[in-house]
Curated annotation (Swiss-Prot):
Subcellular location(s) of the protein: Cytoplasm
CDD domains: Death_MyD88 (cd08312)
Domain TIR: 147-281
The organism of origin for this protein: Xenopus laevis
The protein, known as: Myeloid differentiation primary response protein MyD88-B
Domain of life: Eukaryota
Keyword Coiled coil among record annotations: no
PROSITE patterns: DEATH_DOMAIN, TIR
InterPro entries: DEATH-like_dom_sf (IPR011029), Death_dom (IPR000488), MyD88_Death (IPR034249), Myelin_different_resp_MyD88 (IPR017281), TIR_dom (IPR000157), Toll_tir_struct_dom_sf (IPR035897)
CC terms in the record's Gene Ontology section: cytoplasm; plasma membrane
SMART domains cross-referenced by the UniProt entry: DEATH, TIR
Function: Adapter protein involved in the Toll-like receptor and IL-1 receptor signaling pathway in the innate immune response. Activates expression of target genes in the Spemann organizer region during early embryonic development. Is required for normal axis formation.
Intermediate domain as annotated region, ranges: 106-143
Amino acid sequence: MACGSSMNSFDMNSIPLVALNYTVRHRLCLYLNPNAVVAADWTRLAEEMGYDYLEIRNFDRYPDSTMKLLEDWQKKCFRATVGGLLEMLKKMERNDILTDLAPLIEADCKKYLEKKHGPLPLQDDNVDSSEQYRITKSDDPYGSMPETFDAFICCCAQDILFVQEMISRLEQTDYKLKLCVFDRDVLPGTCLWSITSELIENRCRKMVVIISDDYLDSSECDFQTKFALSLGPGAREKRLIPVKYKPMKRPFPSILRFITLCDNTNPYTKVWFWDKLAKALAR
């Protein structure tokens, strides 16, 4: 990768950011935390990562803004790799960081690859079963890079035909979105509630709630919706996207009335339905 360093023996874009240990992160913070006049600091890095002004201001309230930024980017961005970080530092013209940290980064990447290609570690008896390495079909078996999704699909079994249409419209087209469909993607043998919570809170950027009369009778859908709403008033409006795809006989759920509905039953707006939904999931 063209990062101006000597780390040519690795494909840095294939190594997740989690490979970088505390020493590298701490030294990176020492470089980027101070407000420098001539050198780009952590706020410029946040801009390169795609954060907006209000999000960057929020990071500013933490004692170690750079460390918090790295943790958040690693958690939210599906493409948070060592290579991506190095490319941004190069774009910021922070060659001093690249030169100083290159040996440490290379060492961490070697350790990560050695661990990845070694034997699977045994699960600690003190670790709860909900924290096992694999909970979805495509999870990294070593736990280094959990599988992430654009959206968790909250639905009941009676609406599965519409979910299948969503898959064909959103995953198998130019939108190339990645949906988390519980019955398709989650491995059996895990605790239903804890795995669902993990997926909604940490693995999926959004949650599509498919509203129907059958949805109102589903205890699983009720739990998923209320859990997503409990994650915080600042995030829940952006996280939840209610979808109505067929007429209902029963009242619309009151807890979702304050969130804009994506309605596929309105004949006047039906033509824009899939494009609007795809853009809402991608933003």
